[in-house]
Curated annotation (Swiss-Prot):
This is Cytidylate kinase. Keywords: ATP-binding, Cytoplasm, Kinase, Nucleotide-binding, Transferase. The keyword Ubl conjugation does not apply. Its main location: cytoplasm. It holds the Pfam family Cytidylate_kin. The gene is cmk. It comes from Vibrio cholerae serotype O1 (strain ATCC 39315 / El Tor Inaba N16961).
């Protein structure tokens, strides 16, 4: 990581609002954006496009090393551009998710993608969205944020999103799913979900997105002086 490129990391559990916060911060700061949660799906999609064996580390490592991907904040969405093509919709397909699970299980591929993620830290600055950005990927980042919210609030937000899409979902089932995922993420052996020691912990449970952005920007500006 170049010492001339400021890095802002935003970690936290699923549903805390990391994606929205990172998109807005990248726009306001004029920084590049890294959505680490999508990176394995992007690699899997590149492998599918190029006919690369999803279980061959020898074939996947060079692809991961030179992965041509950009994350662009546009409107209310983050567009994912792979080799010049908008693949945002393709990334959400079940086939892509299944392929991502295969490539994520390969240690050398994970190492190559770690290096590729670190290479995003170039130019005017970077906002990195993930779960271990401040602890593993960018431990020397200038500004680290851990965005949290209660499991109940995260379930409520997700419930509202799904209802707006016309989907019939049960709140209790969503809450249970989020609590189980939290437990897995916080207790896994490799890179457990936790705030970096020098991170600002922001609890968004009772805050609006504007309030979260305002607090985050004040903190970032104090760190990037």
């Amino acid at each position: 990581m170049s010492s001339h490129t400021p890095v802002v990391t935003v970690d936290g559990p699923s549903g805390a609002g990391k994606g929205t916060l990172c998109m807005l911060l990248a726009k306001k700061l004029g920084f590049q954006l890294l959505d680490s949660g999508a990176i394995y799906r992007v690699l899997a999609l590149a492998a599918l496009h190029h006919g690369v064996d999803l279980e061959s580390e020898d074939a996947l490592v060079p692809l991961a090393t030179h992965l041509d991907v950009q994350f662009i904040a546009e409107g209310d969405l983050v567009k994912v551009i792979l080799e010049g093509e908008d693949v945002s919709r393709e990334l959400r397909k079940e086939e892509t998710g299944m392929a991502a699970s295969k490539v994520a299980a390969l240690p050398r591929v994970r190492e190559a993608l770690l290096r590729r993620q670190r290479a995003f830290a170039s130019g005017i600055g970077l906002v990195a969205d993930g779960r271990d950005m401040g602890t593993v990927v960018f431990p020397a980042a200038e500004a680290k944020i851990f965005l949290d919210a209660s499991a109940e609030e995260r379930a409520r937000r997700r419930f509202k999103q799904l209802q707006l899409k016309g989907l019939d979902v049960k709140f209790d089932a969503l809450l249970s799913e989020i609590q189980e995922r939290d437990d897995r993420d916080r207790n896994r052996a490799v890179a457990p979900l936790r705030p970096a020691e020098d991170a600002l912990v922001l609890d968004s449970t009772t805050l609006t997105i504007d309030e979260v952005v305002e607090q985050a920007l004040q903190y970032i500006e104090s760190k990037l002086v």
